[in-house]
Every structure is written in structure tokens, then in C-alpha cells.
């Protein structure tokens, strides 16, 4: 029996291009859960993004940020980016949505699971083949989400979203440099590092360890041999780690890590790193799991969170019903797990696991694959297939 009132209020921000199409598949999963459990979701759709800016002169409607901050229990975002859509200062139109939420809601942890499902090939040299082995790629990378090299842009975006005067970093001089100079400060704080790293250790407690040996391991990836910010990050890692004596510690410099990530992914369990390093490394990690169409993410703070596929809006494919919706569907899986743990709702945690199982079952057959995985299946077709499998599992479980 369904409850009369929705248990959770979910903000749906479809965004631009193919983001709108994969958002439909995310909503399909939410609707499937509602149909077969006593969980209810009040879904509020908020038009936003670059195209919305071109059409209306606004990145999203007034009051949207306040709704996301004060009323929504969780948020889903499709993708942001429309050809030629920029603000007068040159920033991406729609940045107040994705970046403004990250900074304005203090979503300090970007959660990127990197998991290879059975049946997923890798595209190398224009051919689809099996490079990495399922079961040997299963890690979570936590990227600091509010500081570092992107701090100024994040702050400006949050200021616009909250109606404040946009922040600009102070002017600086750089001895020895000539001509035009552009720069972005890279501030890293002990507070920001500590809360991210602590979350990494807490997540490691819930996992099964690294594939190669089953050991719970947290890897600190930085450039502490060069930068002061990374030296602070590593000192903070060592401080926080003292509270988790049962977890193995690992260290690496970001340049070497990119090699180890591709050659020995089975050695990694949980990775913590700074903002820009994590931005680059997680997209490289997406190659191991089959590409950006497989890469889901969560942007998580102490009170709020939003979940999104990490791929772009792919405007050239908009309206063609061909992009991969699995990153979008797995973003809902992450949402269910986060809501469940935040609200002590064990059923939601189980539902998240069933979404993961439904995706795995679909991919294991190796038939319903979109173009990015070497197939011809449609976006909606895959969404329907996974929702159907989930429906069966929910009926059997609940």
C-alpha cells in the first residue's frame, strides 16, 4: 500500500540537451519504486541550464535555489551546457545551477564509484574489446568539491545563485612573468580536507575492500612533493587516519596514480584527493568502467546532496534517443543509498542495491547496449529494460 503523502521530496533538474532525456529514465526508476513499495517521491521538475538562459534570460526560475536548499530531500541533475550559452562575464550559462549548488549547499564531497559490470566492453583504437576484468575494477573516488583550483568559479556561481555580489579573487603579482596573465588561486583548508577524508574512511567501513586482497584501504592521492596545499592535505589525512586503525593506508602522487589506476585498478578501494586532481582522475577512471555513459556521481554535504551522470549534455545527440542512461539510473541508486543512510531507512538502502542488481542483470546479457558500448539500443529501451527488472525484484523483495 502506498502512503498518502510522499516520504521524500525530490528536485529534478533536467538541464540541457541529452540531460533532459536521461532525466526521464531517472524518473522512470523513481516511479517504479513508488509503484512497488510504500516509498513515495514528490518530484518537482525545475527547468534550468544554458538553453533555459537563452530562452528566458535566467539560468533557472527565482526561488529555485531556495527550494533546493530548504525543501528538497535530494536533487537529481541531468546535464548542463548549451552551444553558445555564456553569461556576460564569460562563465558557462547554467553554472549557477551545477556549480552554485555545489558551493552554495556546501556539497564538499564528490562521490564517484568506478565499477566495471560484466558484459561492458572498452572502446580502444576504435574497437570494442575487453581490456579490464569485471570484479577487478570496483573502487570509490572521493574528490573535494568546494575548494582548490575551482574555488573562485564555485564561489562566483554560488553568489549568483544566492543573489550576492559575485566573488572575485584579489589581484596578485607574479615576478618573472610577462605579458597578459590569468590565474586561479588554489586554496586548500584543513577543515575542508578533514571532512572529506573522514567521509572516505567512513565509506571504506561499508565496503568489501580492494578487489585484489579484500583489504579495506584508503589511498591519499596528492602532489605533496610540490605544492603546499597538498602538503596540508596529506598531513590532514595522516591525522584523520589515526581514528581508523583497522584501515590500511596508501599514498600516491597524482601523476603516478594515473598510471596505477589503469594498470592496477584492483589495488584500490577508496581514494581521497583534491578538487582538480579528482576531476581529471575520475574521468580517466570512467574509461575502466566503459565510458562516461556508465559514470554516476553524488555531490554530498552534511545536509544536502544532488546526484548526476557525469557526462555532458551532448547536444549533437539531443532528441535522437541514443545516449546511455545507465549513469543516470545509477545516480538514482546513489540517491537511494544516501537517503536511506541519512534517514535510517533500511528499505531505501536495499532498493539502492536492487537498482544495482537490475543494471548488472541487464548488462550481463550483453544485448541491450547503446552506441557508446558498441550497440544500437535506445536510451528509452534500456531504461524500460532496467525498470522492468527492478519491478520484478521489488515485488519479490517487498
Q: What do these predicted ranges mean?
A:
Residues 16-19, 73, 142, 200, ...:
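Buried hydrophobic positions in well-ordered alpha/beta secondary-structure cores of metabolic enzymes
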Residues 26, 30, 328-336, 386:
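Buried hydrophobic packing segments
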Residues 36-63:
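N-terminal beta-loop-helix "entrance" segment that forms/cooperates
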Residues 45-53, 228-271, 275, 279-280:
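Active-site rim loops that border cofactor/substrate pockets in soluble metabolic enzymes
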Residues 258-365:
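Glycine-rich phosphate/nucleotide-binding loop
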Residues 341-398:
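Internal helix-turn-beta structural module
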Amino acid at each position: 500500500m502506498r502512503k498518502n503523502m510522499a516520504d521524500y521530496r525530490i528536485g529534478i533538474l533536467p538541464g540541457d540537451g541529452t540531460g533532459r532525456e536521461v532525466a526521464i529514465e531517472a524518473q522512470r526508476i523513481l516511479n517504479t519504486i513508488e509503484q512497488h513499495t510504500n516509498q513515495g517521491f514528490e518530484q518537482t521538475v525545475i527547468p534550468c541550464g544554458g538553453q533555459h538562459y537563452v530562452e528566458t534570460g535566467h539560468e533557472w526560475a527565482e526561488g529555485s535555489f531556495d527550494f533546493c536548499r530548504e525543501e528538497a530531500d535530494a536533487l537529481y541533475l541531468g546535464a548542463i551546457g548549451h552551444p553558445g550559452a555564456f553569461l556576460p562575464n564569460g562563465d558557462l550559462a547554467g553554472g549557477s545551477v551545477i556549480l552554485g549548488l555545489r558551493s552554495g549547499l556546501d556539497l564538499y564531497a564528490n562521490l564517484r564509484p568506478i565499477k566495471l559490470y560484466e558484459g561492458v566492453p572498452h572502446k580502444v583504437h576504435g574497437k570494442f574489446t575487453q581490456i579490464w576484468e569485471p570484479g577487478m575494477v570496483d573502487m570509490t573516488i572521493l574528490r573535494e568539491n568546494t575548494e582548490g583550483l575551482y574555488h573562485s568559479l564555485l564561489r562566483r556561481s554560488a553568489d549568483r545563485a544566492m543573489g550576492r555580489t559575485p566573488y572575485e579573487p584579489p589581484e596578485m603579482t607574479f615576478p618573472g612573468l610577462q605579458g597578459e596573465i590569468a590565474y586561479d588561486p588554489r586554496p586548500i583548508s584543513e577543515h575542508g580536507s578533514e571532512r572529506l577524508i573522514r567521509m572516505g574512511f567512513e565509506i571504506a567501513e561499508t565496503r568489501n575492500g580492494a578487489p585484489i586482497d579484500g583489504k579495506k584501504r584508503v589511498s591519499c592521492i596528492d602532489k605533496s612533493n610540490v605544492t603546499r596545499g597538498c602538503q596540508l592535505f596529506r598531513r590532514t589525512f595522516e591525522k584523520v587516519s589515526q581514528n581508523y586503525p583497522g584501515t590500511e593506508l596508501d599514498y600516491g602522487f597524482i601523476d603516478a596514480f594515473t598510471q596505477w589506476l589503469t594498470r592496477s585498478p584492483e589495488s584500490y578501494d577508496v581514494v581521497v584527493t583534491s578538487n582538480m586532481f579528482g576531476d581529471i582522475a575520475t574521468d580517466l577512471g570512467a574509461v575502466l568502467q566503459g565510458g562516461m555513459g556508465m559514470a554516476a556521481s553524488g555531490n554530498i554535504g552534511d545536509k544536502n546532496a544532488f546526484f548526476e551522470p557525469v557526462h555532458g549534455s551532448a547536444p549533437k545527440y539531443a532528441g535522437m534517443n541514443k545516449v546511455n542512461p545507465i549513469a543516470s539510473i545509477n545516480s538514482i541508486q546513489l540517491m537511494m543509498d544516501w537517503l536511506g543512510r541519512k534517514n535510517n531507512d533500511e528499505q531505501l538502502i536495499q532498493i539502492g542495491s536492487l537498482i544495482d542488481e537490475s543494471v548488472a542483470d541487464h548488462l550481463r546479457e550483453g544485448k541491450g547496449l547503446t552506441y557508446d558500448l558498441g550497440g544500437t539500443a535506445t536510451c528509452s529501451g534500456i531504461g524500460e529494460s532496467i525498470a522492468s527488472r527492478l519491478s520484478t525484484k521489488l515485488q519479490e523483495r517487498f
